[in-house]
């Protein structure tokens, strides 16, 4: 379902997420499951970014699949916000990606917008229980709580060591945290009669900075 959003409404929500982050709360959201098409038909002419993933004050999580190699899940939404500009913490990462992308998909997205997702993790072949029956599901709504649970474990260790929780994650992820993420360089998120955005070395609008390594995250936060 597509819900029309105003810039004012999006800004109010985004500012609320920023306030939570300042209070030590880490906000994570699924990037979406429509590839670059977002919630519209795959025959679209322009990419549609999802919200709230476009808000720079939360951490957007995309989906991957497989092991050795781990690749982008083709349904994983990603792109560039039409409401929010590129934040300072990711300006270098986005600039590097856009330079490598060149003219591919030119005119179909806002090259001046905040890029998402920030990170990713496995989002395929999850099992859930519905009315007592086990079902298999895929989606970034599987990936986001998985990444969030890892951050919860890191915060638990930090608090036990007498330190503050991570709170707003993105400045950390795009700096010291990069060393604790597995860079995903294969796959894409098709839509709008295109191959979407390709995963590349470094940040990309399919898998973000990559998938988490718990042990390396502990090292990155000084534990």
What are these regions (language model features)?
Residues 1-223:
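Extracellular protease catalytic domains of secreted zymogens
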């Amino acid at each position: 379902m597509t819900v029309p959003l105003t810039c004012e409404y999006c800004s109010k929500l985004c500012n609320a997420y920023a306030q939570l982050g300042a209070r030590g709360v880490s906000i994570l959201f699924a990037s979406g499951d429509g590839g670059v098409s977002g919630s519209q038909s795959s025959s679209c002419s322009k990419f549609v970014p999802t919200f709230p993933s476009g808000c720079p004050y939360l951490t957007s999580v995309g989906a991957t699949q497989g092991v050795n190699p781990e690749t982008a899940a083709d349904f994983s939404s990603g792109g560039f916000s039409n409401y929010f500009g590129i934040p300072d913490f990711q300006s270098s990462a986005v600039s590097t990606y856009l330079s490598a992308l060149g003219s591919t998909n030119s005119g179909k997205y806002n090259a001046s917008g905040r890029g998402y997702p920030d990170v990713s993790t496995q989002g395929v072949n999850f099992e859930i229980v519905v009315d007592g029956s086990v079902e298999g599901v895929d989606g970034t709504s599987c990936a986001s709580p998985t990444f969030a649970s890892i951050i919860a474990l890191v915060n638990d260790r930090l608090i036990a060591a007498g330190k503050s929780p991570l709170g707003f994650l993105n400045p950390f992820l795009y700096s010291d945290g990069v060393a604790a993420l597995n860079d995903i360089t294969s796959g894409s998120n098709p839509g709008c009669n295109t191959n979407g955005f390709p995963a590349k070395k470094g940040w990309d609008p399919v898998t973000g900075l990559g998938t988490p390594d718990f042990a390396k995250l502990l090292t990155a936060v000084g534990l």
